[in-house]
Amino acid sequence: KATKKITKAMELISASRIVKAQTRVQASTPYANELTRAVSAVASYSSTKHPLTTESEKPIRAAVLIISADRGMAGAYSSSVIKEGDQLVSLRRNRGIEANAYLVGRKAINYYRFRNRAISGQWSGFSDNPTYEHAKEIADSLIGAFIADAQTDKSGVDELHIVYTE
């Protein structure tokens, strides 16, 4: 009976953290949408060739960023994201494109480590309270890989896919 009460309390705490995180995401959605619109407009009407605004004709390597939780008690949150990420990696490989896994959250990291899968980048320990600095660190790493020439640089990627839940 005591274990049941503790488990229920932990579930309530997890639920409140998820609600807080979702509230922060919803608050930033208008900004993100406007930024996406502005970048799309620049990319569409610009004649400048830049790796961030041009699509690779023959992609050879893709980055798959899988965003999971650091801890349990979130139901199928992490397992759903990891499963979807696995399917995306398989799809890319079936099309002859090498897929590099970039992982956020201990759940995804532990899943990949347990199965001895390659990890190109990993971040954890901040899913309860993510900050701009955390997002910037991840973005800088992925942008660096995207800008690098995948033809000549093993860390370079031609595509970037992000797997997350809403």
Tell what function each PLM region has.
Residues K1-E166:
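Conserved loop-to-helix interface motifs that mediate assembly, gating, or partner/ligand docking
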